[in-house]
Amino acid sequence: LGLSLASSKNIYCIDGDGAFLMHMGACAVNGCTGGDNFKYIVLNNGCHESVGGQKTVGFRIHMEAILESCGFAICRAETEAQLRQGIKRLAKQKAALVVYIRPGSRADLGRPTSTPEENKHCFMEAIQA
């Protein structure tokens, strides 16, 4: 949110459905006070894939209705064509794109190798550019 208010660049926030569900209060604040350059993408696979795959209620709630009530225009994608269209639409307005995907990841999917502090410095350098 802070980046979108301090910059004219498009700012993209990408969350999984688990993070969306845990942080709905922030979603309401972002939707109501964020600028038109704030873009929110939710990857909904119905589970916390990165921490063991436990199920969420992501497929059982009306995520788009929640996001719309928070002030976002809504895009929904279940196909590659819808995803491409949704990304184009995001660039033009304050919107949320909910991408419905199947759970599962590659067996050889690596884990992060950088430390949180290295990530912080990389992020700080990127926003200065």
Regions found by a protein language model. Name each.
Residues Q128-A129:
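Charge-patterned, long linear interaction tracts outside catalytic cores
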Residues L1-M124:
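Thiamine diphosphate
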